[in-house]
A protein has these predicted regions:
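Bacterial N-terminal signal peptides that target proteins for export
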Residues: 1-10
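Patatin-like phospholipase
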Residues: 21-61, 69-295
Length: 296
């Protein structure tokens, strides 16, 4: 593990010299999906910045779209670190009203609807379209993207950005290059069966992880010459490891996009493969987030 980190640092430190010597090719950072594991992207962005590498594009899926979208409008890795640690994830991953905004009686009633962690179905009110409508997350994204709440061309952001979702109506990949930033980020991480799809222009948009969880091809199509990828995707499980609904559901998602994932890995110049052993998409505890950011 330590040897791999030294090799990575050497590669990143040498990269700026290569870029400048060759006439400054365009560099893209690609951030994979992975739920809570995606908080490791913040640590990786810190390392890339410390190495002095210029970033011309940022592209992401699911949690990679959240981190990437906020980074593209000027949030620093340090600010993202503070923001992630300041959140009440139990509240955000639910449709419960803000405890500060309700009376005690209503607050007690709402407790039955609070989701402890994603994929845990205890005491969760299941809607027709998904477990969580995502109102609290949508509200947070809207607040964090203040100043970018109108429809915008993502190529005109401080760092050009794109993210990936899937249209559940026909299974097609949807790449956001423009629109309302908060809506695009929310659409990219709308896990089917957990979050209700986002209705937009006749589409039912869900998490892009099943069609393109590591969207290197999107970055290349935008004009990137050099790809730095940050991958927090867990490896495929063996038969003996498929022991829970969470394991099975995660395996299905990973298998859907496995072919494209392998192709995108081959087109990556520098890969930061984060060690996510012991953590899942649902590891939103403070201790887990702190560890994942350090591993990134």
């Amino acid at each position: 593990m330590m040897e791999m980190k030294y090799r990575l640092w050497a590669c990143l430190l040498f990269l700026p010299m290569v870029l400048w010597a060759s006439g400054r090719p365009k560099v893209a950072v690609v951030l994979s999906g992975g739920g809570a594991k995606g908080t490791a992207h913040i640590g990786a962005l810190k390392v890339i910045e410390e190495a002095g590498i210029p970033i011309d594009y940022v592209v992401g899926t699911s949690m990679g779209a959240i981190v990437g979208g906020l980074y593209s409008i000027g949030y620093t890795p340090q600010q993202l670190d503070s923001m992630v640690n300041a959140q009440n994830w139990k509240f955000l991953l639910s449709d419960a009203p803000n405890p500060k905004d309700v009376l005690l009686d209503d607050r007690l009633k709402s407790e039955r609807y609070v989701l402890s962690i994603p994929f845990s179905l205890k005491s969760v009110a299941v809607s027709d379209a998904g477990i969580i409508k995502g109102k609290n997350l949508a509200r947070l994204f809207s607040t964090l993207t203040e100043g970018y709440q109108d429809s915008v061309d993502f190529s005109r952001l401080p760092i050009p950005f794109a993210c990936v979702s899937e249209n559940l109506v026909n299974g097609s990949e949807v790449v956001f290059h423009e629109g309302i930033l908060a809506t695009s980020m929310r659409s990219s991480m709308s896990i089917p069966g957990v979050f209700a799809p986002v209705d937009l222009d006749g589409m039912g948009l869900v998490d892009g992880g099943m069609v393109n969880n590591y969207p290197v091809d999107v970055a290349l199509a935008m004009g990137a010459d050099y790809i730095i990828g940050v991958d927090v995707q867990s490896p495929l499980l063996k038969a003996s490891e498929l022991k829970s609904v969470k394991d099975i559901f995660g395996q299905i998602i990973n298998l859907q996009g496995e072919k494209k994932y392998r192709e995108n890995l081959r087109n990556t110049d520098v890969l930061i493969k984060v060690d996510v052993t012991g953590y899942s998409a649902a590891s939103f505890t403070k201790e887990a987030i702190d560890t994942l950011m350090v591993r990134g």
